[in-house]
């Protein structure tokens, strides 16, 4: 994983790159000779700093998806809301989807800014026990595009993990971008020493989504990231009047259930399609408090309980 010094030029290739200290972007950089010698490619000292910072966080959960648009950030937001309903639990939500930060909108925090304190960056609070951090809080407008190369993304993730003053936290949920990219490698590398409970992988029933989830599962196994389980999102539509279920996205190859059986992965549950979930995300409100008795809410609660049970067993 390429890292980038704080005082590096904009297009720094990263200290682990074969071009470190040699590319045209390195001209004039104060670190050029160090990078060219290979001395900068050693273990990142930030790993130990992050390990110490994360010692105050009991459980760390990554939320992954193979493909965009399957409801990964929606799940992350509602996992945080669901866990925070227990007022005795301190919950933190970290958005590392650097180029597509949707968590501020979903949590009703659009327009909020990061504040610096003596102990680091202060997260933004939704409730007294629910804190959020996102690159979206660093943008002057939610419409601003983040056009960064991998090393700069890695530097931002490192800063989030090392410099945000979460305090004592029971659950840290990390919402990642879709796929398997620099951001995922960064989070896994930096948090592995601190102990990650595991990953929750989000999919929809169609094979076009499942084929990318299989890649995500292989990624987790290669980097030795435990898999808590898979959630099948948009799994049928339950009519609010007649209560009959219709398959909007038919599971042509058996859906997440068959895939989990084939790959020996736990299926945490299925969340039915509910337009009110999207409405809650658009308005920045918790679906649990807006529609507490809907089939989707009940499914979410069962899934969250299974995640909690898994984390408690790992203690």
From Swiss-Prot:
Q: Which GO terms describe its molecular function?
A: 4 iron, 4 sulfur cluster binding; ATP binding; ATP-dependent FeS chaperone activity; iron-sulfur cluster binding; metal ion binding
Q: Name its cellular compartments.
A: Cytoplasm
Entry function? Component of the cytosolic iron-sulfur (Fe/S) protein assembly (CIA) machinery. Required for maturation of extramitochondrial Fe-S proteins. The nubp1-nubp2 heterotetramer forms a Fe-S scaffold complex, mediating the de novo assembly of an Fe-S cluster and its transfer to target apoproteins.
Protein's gene: nubp1-A
Q: Give positions of region: Disordered.
A: 1-23
**What protein does this entry describe?**
Cytosolic Fe-S cluster assembly factor nubp1-A
Record's cofactor remark: Binds 4 [4Fe-4S] clusters per heterotetramer. Contains two stable clusters in the N-termini of nubp1 and two labile, bridging clusters between subunits of the nubp1-nubp2 heterotetramer.
Query: From its record, what is one biological process in GO terms?
Result: iron-sulfur cluster assembly
């Amino acid at each position: 994983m390429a890292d980038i010094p704080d005082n590096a030029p904009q297009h720094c290739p990263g200290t682990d790159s074969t071009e470190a200290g040699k590319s045209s972007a390195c001209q004039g950089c104060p670190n050029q000779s160090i990078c060219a010698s290979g001395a900068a490619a050693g273990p990142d000292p930030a790993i130990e700093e992050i390990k110490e910072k994360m010692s105050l966080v009991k459980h760390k959960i990554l939320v992954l998806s193979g493909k965009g648009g399957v409801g990964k950030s929606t799940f992350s937001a509602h996992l945080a809301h669901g866990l925070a309903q227990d007022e005795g639990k301190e919950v933190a939500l970290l958005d590392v989807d650097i180029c597509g930060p949707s968590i501020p909108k979903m949590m009703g925090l659009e327009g909020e800014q990061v504040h610096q304190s003596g102990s680091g960056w202060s997260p933004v609070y939704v409730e007294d026990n629910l804190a959020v951090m996102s690159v979206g809080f660093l943008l002057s407008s939610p419409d601003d595009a983040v056009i960064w190369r991998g090393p700069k993304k890695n530097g931002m993730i490192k800063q989030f993990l090392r410099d945000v003053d979460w305090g004592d936290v029971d659950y840290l949920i990390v919402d990642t971008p879709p796929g398997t990219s620099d951001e995922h490698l960064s989070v896994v590398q930096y948090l592995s020493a601190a102990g990650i409970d595991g990953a929750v992988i989000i999919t929809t029933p169609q094979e076009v989504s499942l084929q990318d989830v299989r890649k995500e599962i292989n990624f987790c196994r290669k980097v030795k990231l435990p898999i808590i389980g898979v959630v099948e999102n948009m799994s049928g539509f339950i009519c609010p009047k007649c209560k009959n279920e219709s398959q909007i996205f038919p599971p042509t190859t058996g859906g997440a259930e068959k895939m989990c059986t084939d790959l020996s992965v736990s299926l945490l549950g299925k969340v039915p399609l509910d337009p009110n979930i999207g409405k809650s995300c658009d308005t920045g409100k918790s679906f649990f408090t807006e529609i507490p008795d809907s089939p989707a809410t009940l499914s979410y609660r069962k899934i969250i309980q299974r995640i909690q049970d898994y984390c408690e067993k790992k203690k």
